[in-house]
């Protein structure tokens, strides 16, 4: 039986019509039974609990590229200027680490956490005109530039099952399908 063959497919249902401008990065937090996601351009964080239908939204101080749970509670958010802890109870943000202060036109875009707890994330030119993005990893309070650059847009970072290869889509190279 193919993977996913036992999953029921149904028509999409709008459970929380937030009207996102650029909704991205859905992440399910099992401990809370809550779906989290960001609206990058509207500078909003959203959560939705399907069990009771509770939907919440918070304003972010700058564009959020992603949101991920932190062990022990709270969320880590990649905002335009760096990594921030977010407390859903207070709506407060606390800067953990600045990123790319020398590139004010850049923002963080997508992220994932590996099985060792290392955060992998990318940056990008918010205007999508210059390949000024980079790929980073963050662990134990230390930010490391992976040397993967230039990056236009990091999307969908994912690790191979052996944990040795990181894949991500970077929209750096294009081709014209009409070229022969």
What spans do the regions from the language model cover?
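A short helix->beta-strand "capping" segment at the edge of beta-propeller domains
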Residues: 2-19
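A short beta-strand motif characteristic of beta-propeller blades
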Residues: 12-16, 53-58, 94-100, 143-148
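Beta-rich, blade/repeat-based domains predominating
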Residues: 18-32, 60-75, 79, 102-118, ...
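Residue position within the beta-strands of beta-propeller blades
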Residues: 37, 77, 121-122, 168
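Short, solvent-exposed loop/turn segments at conserved positions within beta-propeller repeat blades
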Residues: 40-41, 127-132, 171-172
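A short loop-to-beta-strand structural motif that recurs across blades of beta-propeller domains
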Residues: 44-46, 82, 134-136
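Short loop/turn segments that connect beta-strands within beta-propeller blades
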Residues: 49-52, 88-91, 138-141
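Conserved small/polar residues in nucleotide/adenosyl-binding loops
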Residues: 173-178
């Amino acid at each position: 039986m193919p993977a996913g063959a036992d999953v029921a497919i149904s028509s999409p249902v709008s459970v929380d019509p937030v009207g996102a401008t650029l909704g991205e990065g859905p992440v399910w937090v099992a401990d809370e039974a809550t779906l989290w996601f960001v609206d990058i351009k509207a500078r909003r964080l959203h959560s939705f609990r399907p069990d009771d239908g509770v939907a919440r939204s918070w304003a972010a101080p700058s564009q959020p590229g992603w949101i991920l749970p932190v062990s022990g509670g709270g969320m880590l958010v990649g905002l335009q200027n760096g990594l921030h802890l977010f407390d859903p109870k207070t709506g407060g943000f606390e800067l953990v680490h600045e990123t790319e202060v020398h590139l004010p036109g850049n923002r963080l875009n997508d992220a994932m956490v590996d099985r060792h707890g290392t955060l992998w994330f990318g940056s990008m030119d918010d205007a999508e005109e210059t390949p000024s993005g980079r790929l980073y990893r963050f662990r134990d309070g230390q930010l490391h530039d992976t040397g993967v650059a230039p990056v236009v847009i990091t999307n969908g970072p994912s690790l191979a099952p052996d944990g040795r290869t990181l894949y991500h889509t970077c929209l750096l190279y294009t081709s014209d399908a009409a070229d022969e």
